[in-house]
């Protein structure tokens, strides 16, 4: 979360032109209105980095930062949005939009990728039709997977707050030698995750958290009822006494039932 009092003090000290809100792990809603109030006090703009939350916002399971007071929002068009690699800058401020338009092309960019633009158009068509259902399932599976892991003795960050309200959560990685070490063990078992820093005691030589997200597994068709089995695989992959390759063979076989791409719409020929 954000320490609003500390932010106000710092903002008045350095008088920034812009205050950026966002991060690589977003578990709970950000106090955008409070940040905007501070920005107004010092004449700053507010930029919300929605790189990881783009799908949550598009699916209306996360507050819309531009409505809450952000002047600008940047986001990836892949990650939780599930589109082609790239990003967008959006605003509901006409003056800012005109300035962005004046410098973006030609200027900061010399051309655009027509194929990527077409792919993004298809992605956004999907979101208009089934985006809310996709986003809701990402959150539900994230919460269910976190709970199932906690039940198996794999401690989750922010357990006292319900783990998460997004598609992401974090495992406390110290018992596994750190987040990157844990991620490598999971990779040996055919499971992908990554280390991440958490605002808790450090792990020397490694990260103290292990980040897990659900956009890909939901797109493949996994639902809440599949999270118990997935938690079992993850818990065993993190157990140093368990053979990772034996877990991988089970994961590979289990994964075969999820072969389609879900939350899409058929476009006319």
Question: What are the residue ranges of the model-derived segments?
Answer:
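Active-site lining segments that contact anionic ligands and/or coordinate catalytic metals
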Residues: 70, 84-86, 164-168, 183, ...
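PLP-dependent enzyme catalytic core of the Aspartate aminotransferase-like
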Residues: 140, 204-269
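Generic non-transmembrane alpha-helical segments
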Residues: 8, 38, 144, 148-152, ...
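Intrinsically disordered or highly flexible coil/loop and linker segments, enriched in small
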Residues: 109, 113, 133, 151-155, ...
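Short acidic (Asp/Glu) and glycine-rich catalytic loops that position anionic groups and cofactors
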Residues: 16, 97-102, 119-126, 160-168, ...
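Conserved alpha/beta core surface patches that mediate binding of polyanionic ligands
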Residues: 103-106, 190-197
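Conserved PLP-enzyme active-site core in the AAT-like
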Residues: 1-155, 214
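Conserved small-domain helix->loop->beta segment predominantly found in fold-type I
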Residues: 124, 135, 139-183, 194-208, ...
């Amino acid at each position: 979360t954000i320490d609003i009092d500390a932010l106000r003090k710092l903002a008045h000290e350095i008088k920034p032109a812009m205050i950026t809100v966002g991060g690589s792990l977003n578990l709970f809603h950000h106090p955008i209105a409070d940040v905007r109030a501070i920005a107004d006090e010092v004449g700053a703009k507010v930029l919300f980095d929605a790189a990881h939350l783009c799908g949550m916002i598009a699916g209306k399971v996360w507050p819309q930062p531009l409505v809450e007071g952000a002047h600008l929002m940047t986001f990836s068009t892949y990650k939780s949005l599930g589109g082609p690699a790239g990003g967008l800058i959006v605003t509901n401020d006409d003056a800012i939009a005109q300035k962005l338009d004046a410098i973006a092309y030609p200027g900061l960019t010399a051309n655009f990728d027509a194929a990527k633009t077409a792919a993004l158009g298809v992605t956004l068509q999907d979101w208009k039709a089934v985006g809310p259902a996709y986003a809701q399932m990402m959150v539900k599976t994230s919460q269910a997977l976190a709970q199932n892991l906690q039940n198996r003795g794999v401690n989750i960050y922010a357990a006292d707050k319900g783990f998460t309200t997004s598609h992401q959560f974090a495992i406390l990685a110290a018992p596994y030698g750190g987040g990157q070490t844990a991620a490598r063990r999971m990779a040996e078992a055919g499971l992908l995750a990554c280390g991440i820093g958490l605002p808790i005691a450090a792990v020397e030589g490694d990260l103290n958290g292990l980040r897990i997200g659900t956009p890909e597994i939901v797109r493949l068709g996994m639902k809440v009822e599949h999270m118990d089995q997935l938690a079992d695989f993850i818990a065993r992959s993190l157990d140093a006494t368990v053979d990772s390759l034996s877990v991988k063979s089970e994961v590979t076989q289990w994964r075969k039932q999820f072969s389609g791409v879900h939350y899409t719409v058929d476009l006319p020929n």
